[in-house]
Amino acid sequence: MEELRVELKDKKYPIYIGYDILKKFLKNYRDNYSFSFIITHSFLYDLYKEDLEISQEGIIYVPVGEKSKSFKEVIRISRELAQRGADRKSAIFAFGGGVIGDLTGFVASIYMRGIRYIQIPTTLLAQVDSSIGGKTGINIKEGKNLIGTFYHPDAVIIDIKTLNTLPEREYRSGIAEVIKYGMIMNQSLFNFLEKNTTSILNKDIDILSHIIRESLICKKYVVEKDEKESSLRMILNFGHTFGHAIEAKGGYKRFLHGEAVAIGMFLATYLAYKIGFCDYSVLKRLQDTLLSFGFDLNNPYRIEDLVGYIKRDKKAYGGKIRLILPKEIGKVEIVENLEEKDIIKALKAGDGYGK
């Protein structure tokens, strides 16, 4: 087992990474609170109820999918907590993927003006990305995560064993976020991904531990430098400007988050290449790596149809589009001076972009 620590001005918390560690750490943390509640999906509870060791009274189920990140679910969960006696010394445990983590964190941040919570991510995507950093959020029709807070957990417990029951498509979706870290700041991680594709797809425990740890070190570094996303933290959104637009256009049903981010990273890198921001070799290596992990890189939507979503992206300001574009493998920059028409023109120039 390994331990990392997130060190912020007003909050410090551990990240535990190991195999079959869930039961031990869950018991240790549950003893710290007056009441403990687990927010999860029913199928996850059925798979791990022996590890969770909690009665049905302590479980609050959430439907699967991005549609659960809604005001409707926030109100329902908050009422469930109130009816079951949750007080200010209670804690809620997010046991699931990014949807569960984002939703649970948001509820924790506003219920009784803030109660404690623990992240227990069960998907690769949540383990390497969304479970740390304190971002919580829900979706509205106009875009993803437009309503949210910054609210950090007491701890993050990453049990690699939970990836054994993760469907292949969900697992691959998480790999996109690992590739992102390689692209934005860790060239050696990107090289490792290129050389160990088969072992990663086969869920080799030692290989998984390595890429999870390396990803978290990247995320931890950025969050500690820029907790509230005023500057540096924006680079974590590489691929997400286009990716979130693609997710929203598809009604949060057609694509998993990582699938949309994979297309988004490819579009951003293609754009960078077309405007002379990066060499073709950067685009080619990213393309080859994404394809080797089984991602479909075809954007099914017209670029013009995505622009409305892109202009509502959280990084945008004054109607201007901000994009994270790669200079080379392991280095990206925030680009603010691109015109909408130039983005559309550049992306439409390539075969397979839009219809």
UniProtKB/Swiss-Prot annotation:
Coiled-coil residue windows: none
Keywords: Amino-acid biosynthesis, Aromatic amino acid biosynthesis, Cobalt, Cytoplasm, Lyase, Metal-binding, NAD, Nucleotide-binding, Zinc
Record's function text: Catalyzes the conversion of 3-deoxy-D-arabino-heptulosonate 7-phosphate (DAHP) to dehydroquinate (DHQ).
InterPro entries found in the cross-reference section: Dehydroquinate_synthase, DHQ_synth_AroB, DHQ_synth_fam, DHQS/DOIS_N, DHQS_C
Locations listed in the record: Cytoplasm
Cofactor(s) annotated in UniProt: Co(2+); Zn(2+); NAD(+)
HAMAP family: DHQ_synthase (MF_00110)
CDD domains on file: DHQS
Organism: Dictyoglomus thermophilum (strain ATCC 35947 / DSM 3960 / H-6-12)
Residue positions binding NAD(+): G98, V99, I100, G101, D102, T122, T123, K135, K144, T162, L163, N164, T165
Sequence positions that bind Zn(2+): E177, H240, H257
GO biological process: amino acid biosynthetic process; aromatic amino acid family biosynthetic process; chorismate biosynthetic process
Main location: cytoplasm
Name the record gives this protein: 3-dehydroquinate synthase
Co-factor: note: Binds 1 divalent metal cation per subunit. Can use either Co(2+) or Zn(2+).
EC number(s) stated in the UniProt entry for this protein: 4.2.3.4
Family of this protein: Belongs to the sugar phosphate cyclases superfamily. Dehydroquinate synthase family.
One Gene Ontology cellular component annotation held by this UniProt entry: cytoplasm
Superkingdom classification of source: Bacteria
Catalysis performed (reactions): 7-phospho-2-dehydro-3-deoxy-D-arabino-heptonate = 3-dehydroquinate + phosphate
